[in-house]
Every structure is written in C-alpha cells, then in structure tokens.
C-alpha cells in the first residue's frame, strides 16, 4: 500500500471556514490525503481564506510568499487557495503568485479532487463558479469529528447587501440546506460522539425548508437523543422571527447565548450601511429576546469609522452598547472592500478611527469583565473539550460560551458536568465540579 499523502490546511476567518476546511479535508481524503499540522511535511497546502477586511486578504498573500522556499525545496508540492479571497480574486492570485496550483471558491470545493487531478499535468486551475448543483450533494459523508462540539452549516450566502460587506459577492445568494439532510448529518455527528452542535450560516436565521424556520429546525434537532446543546451563528436582526425568539424560552437545549451583530447605534449610519433596521428596532428586539430567556448572554459586531460617521453617530453607538450590556463584542475599524457601495465614499482619518475604536473597546471590555464577574458563585453546565495545561485540569465551554478551567482529575473530553464558578480572569473562568 502506498504511503498516504499529507494535507495541511490553514483556516482564516469565520466558523463557516472551519466547517468548510473539515469538508475539504474529507473530500481530499478520497484522494488518499490525511491531515498534518506541519506545513513542511505536506504534499498539499491549502489556505482557506477570509475577505472581510483588507488585512485578512493581504495576509494570505504574505503567507503565500512564505511558502516559496517550501515550494522550491519540494517542486511537487501542490498549493491551493480556497475561500472568499479565492472567490474575489480568482485568476489574479495565479498572476501574483506563480507558486499557486489551484484556486477554488467556497461554492466549488466539492470539485477539489477533480481540480487536483488536472494539476498533475502541470495545469493551473481556477474554479470560482456558482454551480447549479448543491456542493453538499457531492461531498462524502462526514466521518471524523474533532471533539464533542461540532459545526453544521445550514445556510450560506446573504441577500442583505450591507454597503460594507463582500459576502453577497463571495458567497452568493442565500441558500438553505434541506431539512432532511441536516437532520441526517446531525444524527451522524451525534453517533460519532458529538454532544453540542452550532448551526452556521452567513445569515443563519434566514434558514427555511419545508415550511420551517430556524426555530422549527432547532426544535426538531433537540429531539435527537444524545444531542445536549444547540447554538447558532451569525444572525441578522431582521430575521429574528417569533418562533426563533420563542425557542430561546421553550427549548432547554438551546444555550443562553446569542451573537446578534448591530454594527452601529446611529440610525443615520445604519441607513448608510443599508442595514434595513434602526437602533430602536434592535433595542426592542433585545427586550423580546431577554423576556424569553432572561439569562441570555448577548454579543455583537461593531464597525467604527464608517464613511460619514460623526462624533454624534459614534456616541449613539456607545449609548446603544450601554443600553444593551454585551458579554463581549467584535469591533473593527471600517475597511473598504473593492466592489462594495461604501468603497466609493471618502474614508475618515485613520487617527479618528483609531481613537474611536479604542474608546468602544474599552467600554465593551468593561462590560465583558462585569459579565464574567457576575458568573462567580453561579452553577453552570460545562462541556469538556480538552485537557488543561495543568495536571488534572479540564477545559470546556459553559452554557454562555465562556471558557472554563476546572480541576477534575477524573474528567474526560466529552463529559457534560455541573460546575460552580469560583473565579474570573480576563478571558476565562475557573470553577469546581459539583457532585464529583
């Protein structure tokens, strides 16, 4: 039997890219590839990329440059670029980087084995089509899982066309995977030891199939024996349907955590962003969600320095943050993306954006620390995902998605235990196992 070929995948960006990387590895497994964590050992290197911000795209080119010595030393090494930079740049990647053998967009990665065959004769291949066939119909059944928590893509693409965002151009229109196939994939994950599933989509709460919305899907998934926890990300405020909000109160397996991006607290900027909602709409939505699940922890996304943002607009964003009280948030300076409507507008001075980002992050950090301190003394569920750095220590995620370190010599990966939180650190909690 010939020795297995080795595949190294570097994943950038969102959770969906993590899921996509797993599926690409499975597709290439049919060609005899096994994963390695060392690029120098690999027969193929695949960069699964993100295009949300300019720095993310440029980092890909920097990483490709660092692969030149490896390609020189191993001329037969195959190098591929996948994901949203691949979709956005296509042939340009081959022009800028002669060492790249193939470029594949996020809707075409089921074709990777065939593309790889075409490179064997020296061809350089690009596939960034939006094929009519569903890529999920052409991928092998998921066989491997990495621990007790897994991602499950239920929806792809976005029809919202926010003025700053490339997702509609790189991922395409909103597409929902069929209900029956999702149920089958979820059951398969549980059979392989998964106890927590996070449902993924660029606009996950836009999912619909067979007359069901995301709330209905969650209710059906919750009936699977052995599946203990459910989460979903990322959502748009306009698609928080009544049945989904109700599921937060009615379904115990749906964890008390929600990431709901708002981007700005200024109605003027929200309109310029084409977000199609107001700050007041968002605040009323938060009230309804908290009425359904009072202990829910909320997180969000913010962009500072969007073209035209005034000091008053920025203060409105700070006011919204104070009004909601977030457990954490991702915040960024505006980054113009080519081809988006906002890219045509004049940008704010860099020093203004830097100062605003610092102020916003200071407020969010203050709220995050308060939220974590409020957990001290409380009992929570923790799903162990790995052993800790210290002997006899386990690390897992709480119901609210906090990382929790627990001294538990008898603990095993996959255990779902009750823990009393005893201490809070900047990015994690510590606790003691109950009933051990």
UniProtKB/Swiss-Prot annotation:
Limits of the TRAM domain: 373-435
Binding site for [4Fe-4S] cluster 1: 14, 50, 84
Keywords, sorted A to Z: 4Fe-4S, Cytoplasm, Iron, Iron-sulfur, Metal-binding, S-adenosyl-L-methionine, Transferase, tRNA processing
GO MF, one annotated term: 4 iron, 4 sulfur cluster binding
EC number annotated for this UniProt entry: 2.8.4.3
Record's catalysed reaction(s): N(6)-dimethylallyladenosine(37) in tRNA + (sulfur carrier)-SH + AH2 + 2 S-adenosyl-L-methionine = 2-methylsulfanyl-N(6)-dimethylallyladenosine(37) in tRNA + (sulfur carrier)-H + 5'-deoxyadenosine + L-methionine + A + S-adenosyl-L-homocysteine + 2 H(+)
Stored InterPro entries: Elp3/MiaA/NifB-like_rSAM (IPR006638), Methylthiotransferase (IPR005839), Methylthiotransferase_CS (IPR020612), Methylthiotransferase_N (IPR013848), Methylthiotransferase_N_sf (IPR038135), MiaB_methiolase (IPR006463), rSAM (IPR007197), rSAM_horseshoe (IPR023404)
Binding, [4Fe-4S] cluster 2: 158, 162, 165
Segments forming domain Radical SAM core: 144-374
Record-level GO cellular component terms: cytosol
SUPFAM superfamilies: Radical SAM enzymes
Cystine connections: none
Keyword presence, Amino-acid biosynthesis: no
Cross-referenced PANTHER family: CDK5 REGULATORY SUBUNIT-ASSOCIATED PROTEIN 1 (PTHR43020), MITOCHONDRIAL TRNA METHYLTHIOTRANSFERASE CDK5RAP1 (PTHR43020:SF2)
Described purpose of this protein according to its UniProt entry: Catalyzes the methylthiolation of N6-(dimethylallyl)adenosine (i(6)A), leading to the formation of 2-methylthio-N6-(dimethylallyl)adenosine (ms(2)i(6)A) at position 37 in tRNAs that read codons beginning with uridine.
Protein name: tRNA-2-methylthio-N(6)-dimethylallyladenosine synthase
């Amino acid at each position: 039997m010939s020795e297995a070929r080795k595949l190294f995948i570097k994943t950038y960006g969102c959770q969906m890219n993590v899921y996509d990387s797993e599926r690409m590895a499975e597709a290439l497994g049919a060609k005899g590839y096994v994963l390695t964590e060392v690029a120098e050992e690999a027969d193929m290197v695949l960069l699964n990329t993100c295009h949300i911000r300019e720095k993310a795209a440029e980092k890909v080119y920097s990483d490709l440059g660092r692969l030149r010595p490896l390609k020189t030393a191993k001329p037969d090494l195959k190098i591929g670029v996948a994901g949203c930079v691949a979709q956005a740049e296509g042939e340009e990647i081959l022009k800028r980087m002669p060492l790249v053998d193939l470029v594949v967009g996020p809707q075409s990665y089921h074709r990777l084995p065939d593309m790889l065959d075409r490179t064997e004769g020296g061809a350089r291949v690009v596939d960034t089509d939006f094929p009519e066939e569903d890529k999920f119909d052409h991928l092998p059944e998921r066989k491997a899982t990495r621990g007790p928590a897994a991602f499950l893509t239920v929806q792809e693409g976005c029809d919202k066309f926010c003025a700053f965002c490339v997702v509609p151009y790189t991922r395409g229109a909103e597409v929902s995977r069929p209900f029956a196939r999702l149920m089958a994939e979820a059951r398969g994950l549980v059979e392989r030891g998964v106890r927590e599933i996070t449902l993924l989509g660029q606009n996950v709460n836009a999912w619909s199939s067979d007359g069901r919305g995301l709330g209905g899907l969650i209710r059906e998934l919750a009936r699977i024996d052995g599946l203990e926890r459910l989460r979903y990300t990322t959502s748009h405020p306009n698609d928080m349907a009544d049945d989904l909000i109700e599921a937060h109160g009615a379904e115990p397996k749906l964890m008390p955590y929600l990431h709901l991006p708002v981007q700005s607290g200024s109605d003027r900027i929200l309109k310029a962003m084409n977000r199609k909602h107001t700050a007041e709409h968002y605040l009323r939505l938060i009230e309804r969600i908290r009425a359904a699940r009072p202990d829910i922890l909320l997180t969000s996304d913010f962009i500072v320095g969007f073209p035209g943002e005034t000091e008053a607009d920025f203060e409105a964003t700070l006011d919204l943050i104070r009004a909601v009280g977030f457990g954490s948030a991702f915040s960024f300076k505006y980054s113009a993306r080519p081809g988006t409507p906002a890219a045509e507008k004049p940008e704010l001075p860099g020093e203004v954006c830097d100062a605003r980002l610092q102020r916003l992050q200071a407020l969010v950090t203050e709220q995050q620390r308060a939220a974590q301190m409020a957990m001290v003394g409380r009992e929570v569920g923790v799903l162990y995902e790995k052993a800790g750095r210290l002997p006899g220590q386990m690390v897992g995620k709480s119901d609210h998605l906090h990382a929790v370190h627990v001294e538990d010599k008898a603990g095993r990966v996959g255990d779902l235990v009750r823990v009393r939180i005893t201490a809070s650190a900047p990015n994690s909690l510590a606790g003691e196992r109950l009933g051990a």
